[in-house]
Amino acid sequence: MSPQTETKASVGFKAGVKDYKLTYYTPEYETKDTDILAAFRVTPQPGVPPEEAGAAVAAESSTGTWTTVWTDGLTSLDRYKGRCYHIEPVVGEENQYIAYVAYPLDLFEEGSVTNMFTSIVGNVFGFKALRALRLEDLRIPTSYSKTFQGPPHGIQVERDKLNKYGRPLLGCTIKPKLGLSAKNYGRAVYECLRGGLDFTKDDENVNSQPFMRWRDRFVFCAEAIYKAQAETGEIKGHYLNATAGTCEEMIKRAVFARELGVPIVMHDYLTGGFTANTSLAHYCRDNGLLLHIHRAMHAVIDRQKNHGMHFRVLAKALRMSGGDHIHAGTVVGKLEGEREMTLGFVDLLRDDFIEKDRSRGIFFTQDWVSMPGVIPVASGGIHVWHMPALTEIFGDDSVLQFGGGTLGHPWGNAPGAVANRVALEACVQARNEGRDLAREGAEIIREASKWSPELAAACEVWKQIKFDFEPVDKLDKTK
């Protein structure tokens, strides 16, 4: 008799409530290559043993419920249940544990991040026996990742489309983010691209408001792109935000962008949802559009250390759902992001194979096989003095995005773009000559400013601007 139809008549049904750990805590279990593995930070309620808490997470995120049910006998729980197979205390934290859970692959629909998250981070996060719960990391088996298209194009294809190699790409978010007319918005796009940037960007909440409807914005931005390309001889782009109230409207906007001949569109993947994002990613691959992803709302989910979901999980999910760029923090700017932790999930976005490394917050070895990589975007409170650090931290396969750091230049938008391009070219040249960007960065920028008045003016404006705050979410102590 098959496991799917096997009954437990020989055992008999016994109604009632029993501890989760009797069924779902299995420290002897050896994980399979096909299992999805999860690392949860568990804070049990007082009096709840860690084994019971970990087992409860495994149960409530897979086959379990609060009481024994008769229909358990109509299937094989051993085949389908999640298993808490290891628990370790968190060093330096009281009553906090990392619980490792293995999920059989058959629990998940192929190619659906939506279904994966509905199971793993669904109801269990409101479970009363837990004071707090955080999903720290996932191991996605190759047998599951191969059911996803992933990024529409990936890093190498994007470079080939843009014909730009050997340096980070430069971007700028148009400010003020709300209130500009479509024509004035397009003017700012043109000035920034003409000044030397590769991309400009809609902000995450620019959709289709009364002051600037999406179609008008798309048309004026396309005009700006073509004019800047003609004058500079470089391929340019603007992230046209296709995010909308319905999937149908979102695709309609992407179709219009394709008809205009622009190279890239944008989506807010958390507020828009994974189903919408995956649909847009498939459209972009089929129609030759790059896809920029904004992570608006991520800090609601990932900023608190004890509860929610770490961004490295959201980053993996985005790579599976599909996107060619995603915002990933800056380390040095105004937004949250510890260096080693940020570099950990940057590698998870870009690389094919990433080894387990707890010093960078990576709980599992991850093999993406042939799935294309995602370019991390550094954006938020950065300016020309940050350029050496950003170039050193993120390397060539990145987008460095200066919004206020371009449009806030005292001479205007185009000079702001010139300043950033000169600073970047100086840093890349210095690095290629063997200079130490971390140690000599300020001197490299000062030297470049001697022959670039635009850069000199930018250096003067932002010479004392720093964002010196401790990150809320830090790596755990190792001992």
From Swiss-Prot:
Q: Where does substrate bind?
A: N123, T173, K177, R295, H327, S379
- The UniProt site entry described as Transition state stabilizer is assigned to K334
**Gene Ontology process terms (BP):** photorespiration; reductive pentose-phosphate cycle
E.C. number(s) listed in UniProt:
4.1.1.39
Residues annotated as carrying N6-carboxylysine in the record are K201
Q: Say if the entry is tagged with keyword Metal-binding.
A: yes
Recorded GO MF terms: magnesium ion binding; monooxygenase activity; ribulose-bisphosphate carboxylase activity
Q: Where does Mg(2+) bind?
A: K201, D203, E204
Q: Which InterPro entries match?
A: RuBisCO, RuBisCo_large_chain_AS, RuBisCO_lsu_C, RuBisCO_lsu_C_sf, RuBisCO_lsu_fd_N, RuBisCO_lsu_N_sf, RuBisCO_lsuI
How the cofactor is bound: the record states:
Binds 1 Mg(2+) ion per subunit.
May I ask which residue range the UniProt record assigns to the signal sequence?
A: none
From the UniProt record, list the residues forming the propeptide. 1-2
Primary localization: plastid
Any keyword Acetylation? yes
Q: Which PROSITE patterns match?
A: RUBISCO_LARGE
One GO CC term of this entry?
chloroplast
Which reaction is recorded as catalysed by this protein?
2 (2R)-3-phosphoglycerate + 2 H(+) = D-ribulose 1,5-bisphosphate + CO2 + H2O; D-ribulose 1,5-bisphosphate + O2 = 2-phosphoglycolate + (2R)-3-phosphoglycerate + 2 H(+)
Q: Where in the cell is it found?
A: Plastid, Chloroplast
Q: Family membership, please give it.
A: Belongs to the RuBisCO large chain family. Type I subfamily.
Its assembly, as annotated, is:
Heterohexadecamer of 8 large chains and 8 small chains; disulfide-linked. The disulfide link is formed within the large subunit homodimers.
Its UniProt miscellaneous note says: The basic functional RuBisCO is composed of a large chain homodimer in a 'head-to-tail' conformation. In form I RuBisCO this homodimer is arranged in a barrel-like tetramer with the small subunits forming a tetrameric 'cap' on each end of the 'barrel'.
Q: What does this protein do?
A: RuBisCO catalyzes two reactions: the carboxylation of D-ribulose 1,5-bisphosphate, the primary event in carbon dioxide fixation, as well as the oxidative fragmentation of the pentose substrate in the photorespiration process. Both reactions occur simultaneously and in competition at the same active site.
NCBIfam families given in the database record: PRK04208.1
Write the protein's name. Ribulose bisphosphate carboxylase large chain
Q: What is the lineage of its organism?
A: Eukaryota, Viridiplantae, Streptophyta, Embryophyta, Tracheophyta
